């Protein structure tokens, strides 16, 4: 057969398959924008700002609608009511991890972020129990965060009030906290291997948040054949996993079955206990993936929030001054801030919450999937369907947060100036797939920011009104622009 004829036949079959799949699924799925054969709704989506496109679609199709990434239908939940009903009220049914082809290529379904079913439940249960045993949610982990905050201050003093890019310094602090749990040690802030690891995580977040990755996720069959930045993600993860494997081997050589030093030891002991179970989820490959997930999630999200937070404090010096006034009044200069202080610092607490609400770090969340056929708001969503939950639609809800596009700590204060909780505050997602380290992340944000502002004034290189706070990436995660500032000792 002539190659040209064969190509035309293949494309025709693909075209007809696309039409059949899209039409056969529409009867059960929510309505949405009409997809084109093969490419779906890609031309109607702004891959530079997916969340904005979904908001526009919701104005036409309501809080539950379907879009197509290539041939694949994706159900989108928009607004607090729909997101809450799915992730909390129907938490078990919506607890699957949805399709994220670029990550799946690297992760192979292992670890905790992108695993599913029995594997995910067993690994998550083990992680939660082990993290609690190593102080998560207890005073002991707070002591570690406070100690790391003091190390961070000493490192910032070494800048001698000169302009500096805070990216890696702010990344080192939360990374060292999670390293103390995983590896039972911490890095020096100038350790080159440490800085290389930080750069790999940082670069991966930037790439994952790029428009190109959204294109790759739309057409996963082409990932292995296309050049582009998605290949750099695989290279970076290979570097990180190589380092993690080195540390695992070190632990294996000195393992004491009766005295676990850290998370890796606990996992290795569990592996030994289940060595005769051929169905065990506790393998070296699983340990590498789990540690890599914890390493990345425990570092990059908190460091990016800190970096964006300082940029906002530079932009709004009047907010910074109020926080420093409250720190001076409640904490003073002779001791470090602690979590007990938070209840006496409503304005500072409001600022920390508003930073997270405003930056909207993961606009469309990590994808979910339904674990069975689900009846949801008069629709039948088939088992395995990928679900996108718009966190932007919750964190930037204009009824709960008037003028949501404005940075305003008043969103979390009542008329008397007391801190005001909000059910709409879900930067860490919600339900069964909620971030395991939420409590630690909140602690780190509060203690790192207050300790920095207790010891330094922040000085911008430009007039505050000229500071650009527009993210340089808006897709998977919102990444702040690069900037420099001076840490002036008080």
Curated annotation (Swiss-Prot):
Subcellular location field: Endoplasmic reticulum membrane; Microsome membrane
Residues annotated for heme binding in this entry: 435
Secretion signal, residue range per the UniProt entry: 1-25
EC number of the protein: 1.14.14.1
Cellular component per GO, a single term: endoplasmic reticulum membrane
Membrane topology according to the record: Peripheral membrane protein
Main subcellular location: endoplasmic reticulum
The keyword Phosphoprotein belongs to this UniProt entry's keyword annotation: no
GO MF annotation terms: arachidonate epoxygenase activity; heme binding; iron ion binding; linoleic acid epoxygenase activity; monooxygenase activity; oxidoreductase activity, acting on paired donors, with incorporation or reduction of molecular oxygen, reduced flavin or flavoprotein as one donor, and incorporation of one atom of oxygen; oxygen binding; retinoic acid 4-hydroxylase activity
GO biological process, one term: arachidonate metabolic process
Pathway membership, UniProt: Cofactor metabolism; retinol metabolism
Gene3D superfamilies, per the entry: Cytochrome P450
Homology family: Belongs to the cytochrome P450 family.
The protein's name: Cytochrome P450 2C18
Record organism: Homo sapiens (Human)
Gene of this entry: CYP2C18
